[in-house]
């Protein structure tokens, strides 16, 4: 039975636990001259090496920083907050108010943010634990994250953007209660978008946020669009 990564691209990628680069299909220098800041530490650890290779293949300069270590947002043209477990580090993340202010200024300037699953959670107002206790987060997106014992989403997904179809997956134990309007939704492979199924994509200012985990090599052009490149659909 093929893995979801095999479905996500037209070729079978190598072992994603390694840092060896892979070929990127149809990648062009759409991100040349752009600097992308990427949160990477114990709170934001869900990063496929192939996704980094995809960004580099399009000419992006990558700059990593650690919210948990108290880092400020580096000078950048775009920001990626990947998945992970920020709810386990809520106190330390909330304490990094320099980073919160930097992200707020980044958004105020209209610079793009891609917040993926845990990255989206970190931007929300707070996290309600299984014990009912609320821990504050960065409060840059309206909404409260609710921890739950059962899965909130699991499986292969696709997300149709203006610049094309991205493939990926979803896996989370939380739900988001928010007043943000749903821009679109992901769907199962080959299925049509349904109003009450799949993962919501939220667009809030220059922030795009979703529980959807994107496999960047599935459509480099669509990824470039997420990070601010002008792509003709």
Summary of predicted features, one role per range:
Residues 81-85, 119, 205-207:
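Short acidic (Asp/Glu) and glycine-rich catalytic loops that position anionic groups and cofactors
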Residues 51-53, 93-96, 128-131, 184-185, ...:
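Short, glycine/charged-enriched secondary-structure capping and boundary segments
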Residues 1-35, 145-233:
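Amide-donor transfer/coupling interface in amidating biosynthetic enzymes
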Residues 62, 85-158:
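Cysteine-nucleophile active-site neighborhood
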Residues 28, 32-106:
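Phosphate-binding active sites in nucleotide-utilizing proteins
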Residues 37-38, 63-64, 80, 115, ...:
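Structured core elements
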Residues 42-44, 69, 85-87, 120-121, ...:
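Short, glycine-/Ser/Thr-/acidic-enriched flexible segments
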Residues 33, 58-60, 75-76, 109-111, ...:
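Short coil/turn connectors at secondary-structure junctions
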């Amino acid at each position: 039975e093929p893995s979801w990564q095999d479905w996500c691209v037209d070729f079978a990628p190598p072992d994603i636990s390694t840092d060896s680069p892979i070929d990127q299909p149809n990648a062009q220098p759409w991100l040349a001259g752009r600097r992308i800041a990427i949160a990477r530490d114990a709170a934001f650890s869900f990063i496929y090496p192939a996704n980094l290779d995809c960004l580099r293949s399009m000419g992006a300069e990558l700059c990593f920083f650690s919210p948990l270590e108290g880092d400020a947002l580096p000078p950048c043209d775009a920001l990626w907050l990947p998945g992970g477990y920020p709810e386990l580090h809520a106190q330390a993340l909330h304490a990094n108010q320099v980073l919160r202010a930097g992200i707020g200024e980044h958004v105020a300037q209209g610079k793009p943010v891609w917040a993926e699953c845990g990255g989206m959670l970190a931007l929300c107002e707070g996290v309600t634990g299984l014990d009912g206790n609320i821990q504050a987060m960065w409060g840059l997106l309206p909404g409260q994250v609710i921890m739950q014992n059962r899965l909130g989403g699991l499986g292969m997904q696709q997300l149709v953007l203006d610049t094309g179809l991205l493939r990926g997956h979803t896996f989370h134990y939380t739900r988001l209660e928010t007043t943000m309007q749903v821009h679109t939704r992901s769907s199962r492979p080959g299925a049509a978008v349904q109003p009450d199924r799949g993962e919501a994509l939220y667009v809030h200012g220059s922030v795009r946020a979703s529980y959807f985990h994107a496999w960047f090599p599935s459509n480099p052009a669509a990824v470039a669009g997420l990070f601010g490149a002008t792509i003709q659909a």
